[in-house]
A protein has these predicted regions:
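Conserved G1/Walker A P-loop phosphate-binding module
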Residues: 28-117
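Conserved nucleotide-binding/hydrolysis micro-motifs of P-loop NTPases
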Residues: 94, 107, 114-117, 152-154, ...
Length: 237
């Protein structure tokens, strides 16, 4: 008999059956691992200025990137239930290193520099855009990069171009719409639909998509559960 499986939040793969007396059939989960990702226990690990510096911890990396001021730090703070886990700034382009946050050696949350910010020197912009490229193409533990898209504004060409670049280079992708509370619902919905329509010209299959608000916490639990599910499945491959 295969052992029971408990996965807090969701139980998966209820396919195993066994026969007992009187020909009764009991359905058991397929495996035993208890998967709980306690995001509130996330801790800052280290900042890196090059991929060569990154210490391989063997934990799956869930990276976050987007245009400057898209709400990336606020999202990471909401995800970890901490006000200052990732440093927020009113000054766009503040994040210029790769910041790692470790969640009990189960998950690495990776805060990547924002792209598309013009008000820094050309040399500095090239340096941290090169850092982004190097990480996305070379990280052996990258599970997915979430591209954050501002739902309060119409589709931005730079977001679509970045997603297309990731698609060409087979970078595993997800999309997180942020700031869904900033405009009236109809306008927000129209912006997201327009973005997805524009994206469909480049992707036959749309990347996994989430809608969030760091202010109201809308969609945060859904994102946490999705990450938890991926970690659970990684343990049972």
């Amino acid at each position: 008999m295969q052992p029971l499986s408990i996965c807090y939040g969701q139980i998966h793969n209820l396919h195993f059956t066994t026969q007992i007396k009187n020909n009764e059939t009991i359905v058991y989960p397929k495996y035993t691992y208890i998967c709980i990702v306690n995001f509130a226990k996330a801790k800052f690990k280290r900042s890196y200025g090059s991929v060569e510096q990154i210490i391989d911890s063997k934990t799956p990396e869930f990276a976050f990137i987007g245009r400057s001021n898209v709400g990336k730090s606020s999202l990471i703070n909401a995800l970890t239930s901490k006000k200052d886990m990732a440093k927020t700034s009113a000054k766009p382009g503040k994040t210029q290193l790769i910041n790692f946050f470790n969640v009990e050696d189960q998950v690495s949350l990776v805060d990547l520099p924002g792209y598309g910010y013009a008000k820094v020197s050309k040399k500095l912009r090239e340096e941290f855009e090169g850092l982004i490229t190097e990480y996305l193409l070379r990280s052996s533990n990258l599970f997915i990069v979430f591209v954050l898209v501002d739902a309060a504004i119409p589709p931005q060409r730079i977001d679509l171009e970045f997603l297309e670049w990731c698609g060409v280079h087979r970078v595993p992708l997800g999309i997180i719409f942020t700031k869904t509370d900033k405009k009236k619902p109809k306008q927000t919905e129209a912006n997201m639909l327009a973005f997805e329509e524009a994206l469909s010209r480049h992707f036959e299959v749309q990347p996994e998509t989430f809608e969030t608000s760091a202010s109201t916490k809308y969609g945060i639990e859904t994102l946490q559960q999705w990450i938890e599910l991926q970690v659970d499945q990684l343990h049972h491959r």
